């Protein structure tokens, strides 16, 4: 259903367009800025713009529509179409006539119950009534206990303990305590609790102790004990020693450079004069010192009648 919407100027209007004849789509509002003039005028995303300031948008491109909206300085008049929202409802026929189905949207009254009125407020076990007339209840315990705790006698004791706090005269009706059975197990348990006993030894330990005492001739329970001796670890005979650097004298761990049965670090394999690293280069030994070619020539003077020739080692 077409609607006329007027936005008071000036810009910004607070909505975004999409579509146009160049997109083969109608001009549609895709976004509304909250609190903007478009939001105040109740424009919604999805509204189709039919006319802008009285001009039909049927043959307008997207840029033409933007220019028309920008040209509106004082007010912007839009004619929009908004899709109607329909709710499905079943059709009920009465006497051959179709009538819409009536729905009662009135809320049903519910009984108000505050939170906590129907809960066990104190830390007491929940009980289920077995006989209301006799006021006897069966306690359901949820503890991991032996079966004996759930016997009729224990349940009755727990019942009387609860009735004492509820009924003032309940203590007069308490049954007399039953006689304690004088069994062998009962007497053994109580004798262990009342009289402290000496620590007991197992039969196998006694036999072993007697055998040891008979062989050694020493009194029972004593034996000679020597303090443990800590052995000093010694080096293995086949262990490989760490090579020593010929220049700095420290051990070499990792890459080793060997020249004439002498070991050096890669960073110590340098000329003794200019400290030039001789790795991947020619090196010379003069009087036990390592030199580059230039400084080796300066220190080595051949005898008269001989000429110095550089000889490189075979790789």
UniProtKB/Swiss-Prot annotation:
Record carries keyword GTP-binding: no
Domain PDZ: 1-84
Gene: PDLIM3
PROSITE patterns listed in its UniProt record: LIM_DOMAIN_1, LIM_DOMAIN_2, PDZ
Protein source organism: Gallus gallus
GO cellular component, one term: Z disc
GO annotation, biological process: actin cytoskeleton organization; heart development; muscle structure development
InterPro entries to which the protein is assigned, alphabetical: PDLI1-4/Zasp-like_mid, PDZ, PDZ-LIM_domain, PDZ_sf, Zasp-like_motif, Znf_LIM
Superkingdom as given in the UniProt entry: Eukaryota
The name this protein goes by in its record: PDZ and LIM domain protein 3
Subunit structure: Interacts with alpha-actinin.
Disulfide-linked positions: none
Bilayer-spanning residue ranges: none
Sorted UniProt keywords: Cell projection, Cytoplasm, Cytoskeleton, LIM domain, Metal-binding, Zinc
GO molecular function, one term: alpha-actinin binding
Listed Gene3D superfamilies: 2.30.42.10, Cysteine Rich Protein
Pfam families: DUF4749 (PF15936), LIM (PF00412), PDZ (PF00595)
Reported tissue expression: Isoform 1 is expressed in heart and in tissues enriched in smooth muscle including arteries, stomach, gizzard, intestine, and lung. Isoform 2 is skeletal muscle-specific. Isoform 1 and isoform 2 are up-regulated during myogenic differentiation.
Function: May play a role in the organization of actin filament arrays within muscle cells.
Segments forming domain LIM zinc-binding: 243-302
């Amino acid at each position: 259903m077409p609607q006329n919407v007027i936005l008071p100027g000036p810009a910004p209007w607070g909505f975004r367009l999409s579509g146009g004849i160049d997109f083969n789509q109608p001009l549609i509002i895709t976004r509304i800025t909250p609190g903007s003039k478009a939001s105040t005028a109740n424009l919604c995303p999805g509204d189709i713009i039919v006319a802008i300031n009285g001009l039909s948008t049927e043959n307008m491109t997207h840029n033409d529509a933007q220019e028309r909206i920008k040209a509106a300085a004082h007010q912007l008049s839009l004619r929009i179409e908004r899709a109607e929202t329909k709710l499905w409802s079943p059709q009920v026929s009465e006497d051959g006539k179709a009538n819409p189905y009536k729905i009662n949207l009135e809320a049903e009254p519910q009984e108000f119950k505050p939170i906590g009125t129907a809960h066990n407020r104190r830390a007491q076990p929940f009980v289920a009534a077995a006989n209301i007339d006799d006021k006897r209840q069966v306690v359901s315990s949820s503890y991991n206990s032996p079966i004996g705790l759930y016997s009729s006698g224990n349940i009755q004791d727990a019942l009387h303990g609860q009735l004492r706090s509820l009924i003032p005269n309940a203590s007069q009706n308490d049954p007399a305590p039953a006689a304690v059975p004088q069994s062998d197990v009962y007497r053994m348990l109580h004798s262990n609790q009342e009289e402290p006993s000496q620590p007991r030894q197992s039969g196998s330990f006694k036999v072993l102790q007697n055998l040891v005492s008979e062989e050694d001739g020493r009194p029972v329970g004593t034996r000679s004990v020597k303090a443990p001796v800590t052995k000093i670890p010694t080096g293995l005979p086949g262990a490989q020693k760490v090579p020593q650097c010929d220049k700095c004298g420290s051990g070499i761990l990792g890459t080793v450079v060997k020249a004439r049965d002498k070991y050096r670090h890669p960073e110590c394999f340098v000329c003794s004069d200019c400290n030039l690293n001789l790795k991947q280069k020619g090196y010379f030994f003069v009087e036990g010192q390592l030199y580059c070619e230039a400084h080796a020539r300066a220190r080595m003077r051949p005898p008269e009648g001989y000429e110095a020739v550089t000889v490189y080692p075979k790789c």
